[in-house]
Regions:
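Bacterial N-terminal signal peptides that target proteins for export
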Residues: 1-8
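Hydrophobic h-region of N-terminal signal peptides that target proteins for export
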Residues: 12-20
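C-terminal-biased regions
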Residues: 23-49, 53, 57-137
Length: 137
């Protein structure tokens, strides 16, 4: 009976082990990447605190979200900044924790969640840039 119990226990462990072995690893930013992002987000937050849409646009990949109608700082201010960077959302980004993840295209991204929106910052050849605002679903 003892032998049978051990076999059943071993079989159960063999069946459960792959679930633990295949658990997805959480991406972690390298210290150098984290340092680079910390420098960027500090400047971005300072621009938000000053309500400086031109400075924010300077740290944004344009055309914004590949929308040809948002190609420069003036268009960004009118179509994105006024709507998405309210005082409440600016305050949220200033105090919100940025979460790192690497996407399917191997891009390094940080996300700041503010209520129903996600603000996305992506590492580009030019350094980090604000690249997207989307719905937090």
């Amino acid at each position: 009976m003892r032998f049978l119990s051990r076999i059943v226990l071993a079989a159960a462990l063999v069946l459960v082990a792959p679930a633990f072995a295949q658990a997805p690893k959480k991406d972690v930013a390298s210290p150098a990447l984290q340092k680079e992002f910390d420098g960027f987000i500090g400047k971005f937050r300072a621009a938000l605190k000053a309500n400086d849409s031109a400075a924010v646009a300077g740290m944004t990949r344009l055309p914004f979200m590949n929308d040809g109608s948002i190609r420069d700082a003036a268009q960004f201010h009118e179509k994105i900044y006024k709507r998405e960077f309210t005082a409440k959302k600016r305050a949220c980004i200033q105090r919100g924790k940025a979460v790192y993840d690497r996407d399917g295209e191997n891009n390094d991204n940080y996300f700041v969640f503010c209520g129903d929106l996600i603000f996305v910052f992506t590492k580009t050849p030019a350094g980090f840039l604000f690249t997207e605002v989307g719905v937090n679903d």
